[in-house]
Regions:
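Bacterial Sec-dependent N-terminal signal peptides
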Residues: 1-4, 17-46
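Sec-dependent signal peptide hydrophobic core
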Residues: 5-13
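N-terminal mature-domain "stem" immediately C-terminal to a signal peptide or N-terminal signal-anchor/transmembrane
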Residues: 39-74
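Amphipathic alpha-helices that form helix-helix packing interfaces
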Residues: 63-70, 89, 96-103, 159-162, ...
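Post-signal peptide N-terminal segment of secreted/secretory-pathway proteins
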Residues: 64, 68-141, 145-147
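Internal, well-ordered alpha/beta segment that forms a basic, Gly-enriched binding/recognition surface
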Residues: 125-176
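Long, flexible, surface-exposed domains enriched in hydrophobic/aromatic residues
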Residues: 208-216
Length: 221
């Protein structure tokens, strides 16, 4: 069944690549050429436009919205440490992760061009490095600052960024971790890393849909 479900995706990807190649060929024509699209190119363009609008943009918008919600729920958890708030964070994390896994069907464009895939989804997690970060008081202080998301994105390596670091802090044996087992400095780290994750997911959305489609007004470059 999966083979048949994948066919529309493969067809759309082929259409995008074929149409882009055709357009580039026309641009490289030293004589200018006929700028009007052929009927075949128009069909390819329609397929590509439909795939971009109804699949890529919808997926990246859902991903960006859920990662923004994840940051806010992590902040709420740090302010009010309850098991219910842990569960709320974990539910939002899983929603965001589900959108990301859908997007793995088309990791071309911004996801590969800007290195976003390895930045937010490198595995395995560098657990020793994470534990060292928890002992580094200057780094914890930096992750408490207003620009902690930017600091994390620049200073932490990909093995400490993205989904898997947050997952380690929030889950235990596949279930939400007891709030009593989560330290404040671990939440500080999780919030900073989630902020960087959100920024990268908005970069994906903007790259495909344009900045005007993004509601997060404080997005940093």
């Amino acid at each position: 069944m999966k083979k048949f479900l994948r066919f529309p995706l493969y067809a759309a990807m082929a259409a995008i690549m074929t149409f882009n190649f055709s357009a580039c060929s026309d641009d490289d024509d030293p004589d200018g050429g006929d700028t009007e699209l052929s009927e075949k190119d128009k069909r390819y363009q329609a397929i590509a436009d439909q795939f971009t609008k109804n699949t890529v943009i919808v997926t990246y918008t859902g991903l960006a919205d859920q990662t923004e919600a994840l940051v806010e729920k992590l902040k709420a958890l740090k302010a009010d440490k309850t098991d219910d708030n842990v569960k709320s964070v974990c539910e939002t994390f899983l929603n965001a992760r589900a959108w990301w896994e859908k997007s793995e069907a088309f990791l071309f464009g911004a996801a590969s061009d800007f290195g976003i895939d390895p930045h937010i989804d490198s595995w395995p997690l560098d657990l020793d490095g994470l534990l060292d970060e928890m002992k580094n008081t200057s780094h914890i202080t930096a992750m408490e600052a207003e620009d902690a998301d930017v600091w994390a994105g620049v200073k932490l390596g990909p093995e400490l960024l993205g989904f898997h670091g947050i997952e380690y802090i929030m889950f235990e044996a596949g279930s939400p971790k007891a709030v009593s087992k989560i330290k404040d400095k671990e939440l500080t780290y999780a919030i900073a890393v989630a902020g960087d994750l959100r920024n990268k997911c908005y970069q994906l959305q903007i790259s495909w849909a344009g900045a005007d489609t993004v509601s997060y007004t404080h997005l940093r470059a």
